[in-house]
Amino acid sequence: MIVVDTTVWIDFFQGAETPEDLHLQRLITAGRSLALTDLIFCEILQGVREDAKFERTRRTLLLYPILRMEQLATFEHAARIYRTCRRRGLTVRKTIDCLIAALCIAEDVVLFHKDADFDAIARVAPLKVYRLPKGVS
């Protein structure tokens, strides 16, 4: 299963035609197993300004499984990830990224993103990161 991060979904919903957006479209068309987390769901929806677009976006997102943060251990793991990054001189700008990473690690899923925070986290934690296939730009 591939968890698609907010950074990729935003490009998708805006029709940005970035490499990530276009690749997500291909993954959807191919019927790949995609998901998101409850925090990603919230991040995407909070950025939608218009009511009609909010509802369309919400309905689209609800087509995919939503992994939920239910275990206190996930929050503790996120704190440990943040502390490890800081100790190694890596800046993680958003705690929410540590939470998403901790849940992806706990659920043993791959994260498709375009956020430098996750690259930093993957350097110190066993976060599986989805990479665009070679030749995709």
Where are these regions (language model features)?
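A general structural signal for well-ordered alpha-helical segments in protein cores
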Residues: D21, F41, F54, F75-A78, ...
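Short beta-strand scaffold positions
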Residues: V4, L36, M69, F112-H113
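Conserved glycosyltransferase catalytic-site signature
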Residues: T6, D38, I96-C98
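A generic structural signal for short hydrophobic patches within well-formed alpha-helices
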Residues: W9-I10, F41-I44, F118
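Active-site neighborhoods of divalent-metal-dependent phosphate/nucleic-acid chemistry enzymes
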Residues: I66-F112
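Short, well-structured N-terminal submotif of metal-dependent ribonuclease cores
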Residues: M1-L36, Q46-R59, V136-S137
